[in-house]
């Protein structure tokens, strides 16, 4: 029996189940999106939504921008949130979702399965649960930023994230 055939089938199934990461490289550099806009990327839609500041006030005056500074740690383009949230319209339900991020100031918002959190940064979410989903944050903090990756593990039926000076890349859903 040929042992490589079953292995290649397993690899193909793993690639299919893991879905495609949204890397934003199909977006025009420096494009700006205001609250209420939709971003079509990687065959998916991302809605740009209002943002909640640390004091609880909601703002609709922010914007998103396609950036290529590499702060989030991915390659090519990334999305920058300036007082906005990104509502990812993915093929739910998911069993896992990962993303790379950079926080250069201000607070962050995250919502998983309609469980909304407004936090000073993502470090405090490590080893917690949001919306019944386990959260793991691996990040490095220095004087001016926090850069890392968040892993959401569990039944995911909705995902929104954003910040004030926040970059995101390589949003990878797993069904």
Where are these regions (language model features)?
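Bacterial N-terminal signal peptides that target proteins for export
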Residues: 1-9
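Intrinsic low-complexity, intrinsically disordered segments enriched in polar/basic residues
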Residues: 3, 20-21
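Short N-terminal leader segment in a subset of presequences, especially plant chloroplast
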Residues: 8-12, 30
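Hydrophobic h-region of N-terminal signal peptides that target proteins for export
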Residues: 13-19
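Surface-exposed, well-ordered secondary-structure segments
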Residues: 21-175
């Amino acid at each position: 029996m040929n042992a490589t055939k079953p292995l290649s089938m397993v690899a193909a199934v793993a690639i299919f189940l893991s879905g495609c990461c949204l890397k934003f490289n199909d977006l025009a550099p420096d494009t700006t999106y205001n609250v209420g806009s939709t971003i079509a990327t990687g065959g998916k839609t991302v809605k740009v939504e209002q943002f909640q500041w640390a004091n609880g006030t909601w703002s609709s005056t922010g914007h998103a921008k396609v950036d290529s500074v590499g702060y989030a740690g991915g390659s090519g383009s990334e999305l920058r949130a300036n007082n906005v949230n990104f509502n990812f319209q993915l093929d739910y339900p998911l069993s896992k979702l990962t993303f790379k991020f950079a926080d250069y100031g201000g607070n962050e918002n995250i919502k998983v399965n309609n469980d909304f959190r407004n936090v000073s940064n993502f470090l405090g979410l490590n080893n917690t649960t949001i919306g019944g989903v386990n959260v793991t944050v691996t990040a490095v903090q220095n004087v001016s930023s926090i850069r890392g990756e968040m892993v959401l593990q569990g039944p995911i039926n909705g995902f929104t994230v954003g910040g004030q000076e926040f970059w995101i890349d390589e949003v990878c859903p797993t069904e």
